[in-house]
Amino acid sequence: DKTICALDKVSLRTLQNCMQSVFEDGPKRDRRLWLGDLRLQALANYETFKKNDLVKRCLYLFAGQTKDNGQVSACLFTEPEFIIDDTFLLDYSMFFGATLADYYAATGDMDTLKDLSACAYRQMEIAAESFDENDLIKNGDGFWAFIDWTEGLDKQAAMQGVYVYCAKKVQEIAGILGNKEKEAELKTEVKEKTEAARNYLLDSQSGLF
């Protein structure tokens, strides 16, 4: 299909233009590295340009500059120096572990997986503090998670899903590294949070969360 091929060509050029010293948000926009964007850009890169060292660089930049509690920032600036923004989004923080797991799956880079695993574990520990007694994630105040730009959007169900997805990814990391305790802990988290989503967030009539 000519249209699909044309779209693919433009998409690849767009991705290439964003691959500078980091994966930029856009060469003509704010030119920042966003963690949520990095995850998707990296997945496309593994199938196309295979500039995997650039993904590695971005992961280390995020892990190397965190809040005092260990949470990674949602984005960082590259000029005039590398510095994190004061924007912290819970879904983006959790995506650090998922992005690391994807990077390992694409590269087999065990050294980086070992080196950054503690940061991945920490993001899930921080996120786990946001759940109530029913194992449901609590809506935060202000700009606490991204999910989508829609004004007034209730992000609870989506964030519950992000937590389960990322917990599964980080559980994979723990399993690969032989960390049985962390693997079991995350397996339990996945089970409990999935059950809570089905019990409290699922609309039985529509079949949607």
Where does each model-flagged region fall?
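Substrate-binding groove/exosite segments of carbohydrate-active enzymes
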Residues: 1-129
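The feature captures the catalytic groove of carbohydrate-active enzymes
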Residues: 69-96, 105, 110, 127-209
